[in-house]
Amino acid sequence: MNYRRVFIKNGLVFLTIVTNDRIPILTDNIKLLNQSYNNVIKYYKFDLIAYSILPEHIHCIIKPIIIEEYSKIVKSFKYSFTKNYNVGLVNPTYKRLWQNRFWEHTIRDENDLNIHLNYIHYNPVKHGYAKSVKDWEYSSFYKFVKKGLYDINWGSNTDIKEIIDLDFE
């Protein structure tokens, strides 16, 4: 089956990247995730707009300078993290750290962007990792609060009907 990706110049892309068998290793390896991100941006230029890191998956929105490269960005990120994770392990615990593919969605407009931003930031609550959005430290939520785009209590006293049943994983 041929999978066709949509490429919109100067576009934003929502991504979901999941560990193989949903092994919960990501939040215990934030330093390695940061190293992997820093390795990737040396080769592929993109802005990281928003993110949420959960133990077994990552949601993010990126804006690649060259839109056609977002698949290469994901591949490079997975490779870098896997390489760094396995360094020093005599017998790597997991032969494959990531699911083969990733979920991607091209953001269509401002409303679509807002829905995906809300989904990203509410996701740790949805999965039971935090009681409120502000309690989860592995996301870009506070960056958006600082810019005045979210109230600090967003998600705990806000109607979230538009995102509660969404599943972008």
Language model region names:
Residues 1-169:
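Short catalytic/metal-binding and nucleic-acid-binding patches
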